[in-house]
């Protein structure tokens, strides 16, 4: 869970944080518009939950854990490099995610399958 106001404040006071946490693809909606702070906070909640499911891999790059939207709008987790390697060690081969944001809170559930 991520408090949207706290997340927004952290982004505002830390130059470059958005680019460190999110790929260019994640920062835009499927129609190419900038994604809102609540949506970014929810995507960060997914990344944080995935990292915790893997025991917070040493040297994890946030870009190696990307939340993308399918054509249907359904969110999907794509893992590469550092996160993919950590998942392989744990036998994780697939992910299920759910994202929500309401009343100033962004929440995510991540299930690592293998």
Where are these regions (language model features)?
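Core catalytic alpha/beta fold that binds nucleotide/phospho-ligands
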Residues: 1-114
